[in-house]
């Protein structure tokens, strides 16, 4: 009986800890998204890119210019540029200095380095999980601060270093 009471008590403690994490998550304020460039399905009509209601296999950035009332479209290609990027989790303590990088569309890049070198931080900056202190990050020539976060994240493919495979075939794990 003492063994069972101990196991039940342990289950209660684990449940309370899980509940506490859930309530902390529910209390979080939603992240602000001030982006206005969106990702849309598109088609080419002659040399002009137009938005499509159907899935076309082609994506474009839709940029509405408030000042002129004009909407333009730019085909999603996928080049990423870091131009003199500075970042620190605490703005007073910059940990990444003058980062310059260019990734061509479709190019596969691996960030390699020791623990704490900034590999994950760079992928977090591309996803706009954090804002940079200085410099620019551009995606297809567009400052990523102008792109809606959800659309930006939909357009990226990132493979992290920790892979988790489950029982089954490779296809079942995909």
Residue map of PLM features:
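ATP/adenylate-binding site constellation spanning eukaryotic-like Ser/Thr protein kinases
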Residues: 18, 28, 149, 153
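ABC-type nucleotide-binding domain
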Residues: 42-174
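Short intracellular "coupling" helices and adjacent cytoplasmic loop segments at the cytosolic face
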Residues: 24-42, 89-90
């Amino acid at each position: 009986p003492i063994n069972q009471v101990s196991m039940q008590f342990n289950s209660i403690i684990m449940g309370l800890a899980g509940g506490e994490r859930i309530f902390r998550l529910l209390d979080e304020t939603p992240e602000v998204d001030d982006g206005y460039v969106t990702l849309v399905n598109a088609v080419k009509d002659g040399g002009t890119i137009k938005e499509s209601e159907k899935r076309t296999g082609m994506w474009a950035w839709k940029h509405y210019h408030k000042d002129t009332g004009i909407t333009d479209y730019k085909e999603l290609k996928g080049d990423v540029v870091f131009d003199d990027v500075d970042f620190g989790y605490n703005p007073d303590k910059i940990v990444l200095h003058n980062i310059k990088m260019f990734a061509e569309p479709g190019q596969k890049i691996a960030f390699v380095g020791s623990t704490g070198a900034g590999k994950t931080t760079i992928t977090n900056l591309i996803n706009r999980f954090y804002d940079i202190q200085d410099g620019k990050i551009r995606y297809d020539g567009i400052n990523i601060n102008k792109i809606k976060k959800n659309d930006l994240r939909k357009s990226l493919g990132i493979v992290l270093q920790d892979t988790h495979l489950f029982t089954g075939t490779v296809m079942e794990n995909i």
